[in-house]
Amino acid sequence: MDLHNIREDYSKRELSEGDCADNPIEQFERWLDEAVRAQVNEPTAVNVAAVDGRGRPNSRMVLLKEVNSEGFVFFTNYHSRKGRSLDAHPFAAMTFFWPELERQVRVEGRVERLAEKLSDEYFESRPYQSRLGAWASAQSEVIPNKAVLVAKAAAVGLKHPLHVPRPPHWGGYIVIPDLIEFWQGRPSRLHDRIQYRLLDGGWIRERLSP
């Protein structure tokens, strides 16, 4: 397959310094709102990259579940490969991609586990079958076949027919950003890139060469 000529030329929008909020979280919320209103497919889907204890990188798509003044929140199995990586090296990079708007957002920062109370609250909001799955799946572990997973989920359902408590190995992380970059595709690959860096407790905004 020849991939050389598969490309898009971007021309829908531009991003100037005057368009940007002083705070990158506010700017992100603006862009996320625009992505939702534009009916972008999976606007909260984000790639999370981490490094394990051997220095090997790994990445996964997860769903952003909250953004606030502290950072970006997602939930996962703490025993999964990404969970073990984040516990070993508590730093992550996130990338949002909204092709319909020709936009990307990159986030880098320190990672912390959420307070158990907050993980409990979110877990209670999940559909019943999803809560069963959190108990049934030893995420990232090799299993002999799918039937084993289905049987485990059924067993959890028999044990917890009404209320499924949060497993201790499942919960949230928050990425506390020290760098956020907004990328807007432009013609001739002269893309707009506006970066915010945290310095001495305040955000510095600067333009990057594409």
From Swiss-Prot:
UniProt EC number: 1.4.3.5
Cofactor: FMN
Keywords: Flavoprotein, FMN, Oxidoreductase, Pyridoxine biosynthesis
GO molecular function: FMN binding; pyridoxamine phosphate oxidase activity
Catalytic activity: pyridoxamine 5'-phosphate + O2 + H2O = pyridoxal 5'-phosphate + H2O2 + NH4(+); pyridoxine 5'-phosphate + O2 = pyridoxal 5'-phosphate + H2O2
Superkingdom in the source lineage: Bacteria
Binding site for substrate: R7, E8, D9, Y10, K65, Y122, R126, S130, R189, L190, H191
GO biological process terms held by the UniProt record: pyridoxine biosynthetic process
Enzyme class per UniProt: oxidoreductase
Oligomeric form and interacting partners: Homodimer.
Stored NCBIfam families: pdxH, PRK05679.1
Listed name of the protein: Pyridoxine/pyridoxamine 5'-phosphate oxidase
Organism: Neisseria meningitidis serogroup C / serotype 2a (strain ATCC 700532 / DSM 15464 / FAM18)
High-level lineage: Bacteria, Pseudomonadati, Pseudomonadota, Betaproteobacteria, Neisseriales
